[in-house]
Swiss-Prot record:
GO terms for molecular function: mating pheromone activity. It comes from Schizosaccharomyces pombe (strain 972 / ATCC 24843) (Fission yeast). This is M-factor. Keywords: Lipoprotein, Methylation, Pheromone, Prenylation, Secreted, Stress response. The gene is mfm3. Residues 1-29, 39-41 form a propeptide. Induction: By nitrogen starvation. It is further induced by a pheromone signal. Its transcription is limited to M cells. It comes from the Eukaryota.
Length: 41
């Protein structure tokens, strides 16, 4: 879980235009049952 959260955070940090859109794509790439989607988004 920690490594996944770090990857998601890195994706958001590296994206300056639409971080929320990138976050949604990143979360969906991992699994549709990720609780972080509700916590971060």
């Amino acid at each position: 879980m920690d490594s996944m959260a770090n990857t998601v955070s890195s994706s958001v940090v590296n994206t300056g235009n639409k971080p929320s859109e990138t976050l949604n794509k990143t979360v969906k790439n991992y699994t549709p049952k990720v609780p972080y989607m509700c916590v971060i988004a």
